[in-house]
Design a protein with these regions (language model features):
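C-terminal soluble interaction/assembly domains
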Residues: 143, 152-168, 173-175, 194
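Terminal peptide-recognition signature
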Residues: 33, 62, 82, 123, ...
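Short acidic catalytic loops
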Residues: 33-34, 54-69, 125-126
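Short, small-residue-biased leader/transition segments that mark boundaries at the very start
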Residues: 1-8
């Protein structure tokens, strides 16, 4: 699961870059965006540029495999381009005491639609077990939108606000200080299942093909 930067680079495929995202148009007129790190900034100008370039495409693949997270603001900015209305995407809880279960009542989280260019067609989001933290939150938001399907493997989880510390022996510890629940108030800390599970095939890999991208392309062709 290496995304645009590897398989397609070896095929000599051209792609554009806007902020932290790489994007291109595949042969069957399907748009493809690879966002490998939400720590890499993306602004509204970047998102306008990408969606304008891909606007004639019949469908869109957003690849966040191996995206270990980063800045939740970037993840939210991107998600806002895929809804036309304010959508409840989950809840967050905050620690209120030292007890194991001392948490506040769940506070709702909404994604508001962007007031700029918004994508109106089908979207497939590609995920794997290395999609963590802010990426997990992004995937959780995206699956609340009616035109979005998740394909690949379960995400790595780790939503919520991370807390980092160092133990006396020098080991680092990192955990979610504020549990994040989905819209049905279920925990998503341990990952989000795809709508369709697809594994990489060794044969495809040897032929410089990405099984999961190929499956997403097939699915988008069927739904067009």
């Amino acid at each position: 699961s290496r995304g645009l930067g590897d398989v397609y680079k070896r095929q000599g495929r051209d792609y554009r870059i806007a902020g932290g995202a790489k994007y291109t148009i595949l042969e069957d007129n399907i748009g493809y965006i690879y966002y490998g790190d939400f720590s890499s900034g993306i602004g509204n100008g970047n998102l306008d540029e990408i969606l304008l370039y891909l606007s004639a495409c019949n469908g869109l693949i957003i690849d966040v495999r191996n995206n270990g997270g980063g800045n939740l603001t970037n993840a939210t900015l991107m998600a806002q381009r895929f809804t036309n209305e304010k959508i409840l995407t989950g809840y967050i809880q905050h620690k209120t005491g030292k007890g194991h279960n001392d948490f506040s009542d769940p506070t709702p989280i909404y994604v508001e639609p962007s007031n700029s260019i918004r994508w109106q067609k089908k979207v497939i989001v590609l995920t794997n077990r290395h999609s963590y933290s802010a990426t997990n939150d992004f995937v959780n938001s995206m699956r609340c939108f009616p035109n979005v399907t998740l394909v690949g493997d379960k995400t790595g989880g780790g939503s919520g606000l991370p807390f980092s510390s160092e133990l006396p022996n020098g080991w680092g510890v990192r955990f979610s200080a504020s549990p994040h629940l989905d819209a049905q108030k279920q925990h998503i800390e341990f990952g989000i299942d795809p709508d369709k599970k697809v594994d990489m095939s060794k044969e495809d890999e040897n032929n410089d093909l990405d099984t999961i991208i190929e499956e997403a392309r097939k699915m988008l062709k069927v739904t067009l």
